[in-house]
Amino acid sequence: IPLLQNGTFDFECGSTTNNLERQKQAAFSDTIFVVGTRLLTKKGGEIKDFADLKGKAVVVTSGTTSEVLLHKLNDEKKMDMRIISAKDHGDSFRTLESGRAVAFMMDDALLAGERAKAKKPDNWDIVGTAQSKEAYGCMLRKDDPQFKKLIDDTIAQVQTSGEAEKWFDKWFKNPIPPKNLNMNFELSDDMKALFKSPNDKALN
């Protein structure tokens, strides 16, 4: 944010969450992606949703919002989960794969990426009602409404024309070179709603 404010760059467009706290310091474009915090677990197993985690070992990546959320869920709902904090997403997946945990909690798009890299991606499912949702947007300076309008209009045109859905299918539902990994990640209802009605609302 300081680099944006001092003019080092004019806008940033990656996986930056648009939230109320950040809106105090920066403006955000229309949302480009919506993620939900869900679970990766063995296909056909006993875990279908968060309630099934009672008394079970669950892995989460250390230092993430998902880690905070999982501890909160465990305390508030008295679920007696054994929470394992792994150093990165790859380590979290290895903990799941080895059977030391029954589920891995994280943003659904990141879970799809880890599943795609697995030896047998078809053995794993992303399940559960999203415990939180985050909107990713391009971040720009607060004092430039004309620039924001240009970015928003461009995003809205791509989303409402059907072009964004084509891009989504290409990158999330088909093999990606050079390793030909396929994320097999479906367009969520939140994303479908976003493409119909582009907006810059924070979800948290």
Predicted regions, residues:
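Extracytoplasmic/secreted envelope proteins and their assembly/folding machinery
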Residues: 1, 5, 9, 25, ...
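Acidic, polar ligand-binding/catalytic clefts
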Residues: 1-52, 192-202
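Bilobed "Venus flytrap"/periplasmic-binding protein-like clamshell domains
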Residues: 2, 16-17, 34-93, 109-110
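Short, Asp-centered acidic motifs that coordinate Mg2+ and/or phosphate
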Residues: 6, 10-11, 102-103, 137
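A ligand-binding cleft/hinge motif common to bilobed small-molecule-binding domains
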Residues: 14-24, 69-74, 97-98, 102-132
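Periplasmic-binding protein-like
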Residues: 33-41, 108, 116-155, 174-199
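Extended ligand-binding regions for polar small-molecule ligands
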Residues: 51, 56-57, 62-64, 112, ...
